[in-house]
């Protein structure tokens, strides 16, 4: 699977969805990981770190979204990103859909498969939601790495 890590463009959001170690694990499982140039800068992860982990650095967000079957983000897409989302593409991020009808409508219109971090549970019997880190690690590692 082709996995994309675009740079976050929402105001005051400096995190990145995947560390170099995460990229290494995904690549080791047979996936291709495309990281937008500078995506990790706000989290002190260099492009070189991603390359050493097996990722491919792309120059633009458009390239990352275009080449990727799965997009890993931290925050919900904003208006400037809606046009990049395509039918059948998987978007895994915090969505907070109750707060944005516009985002909800854009996701529906795109035909993508949107998975919200805040709704992922580690234990199906548990009513407790996972932390940001747990939800990403669990779903990405469990689902993607098993598809090797």
Model-based region annotation:
Residues 132-148:
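Positively charged, low-complexity/disordered segments
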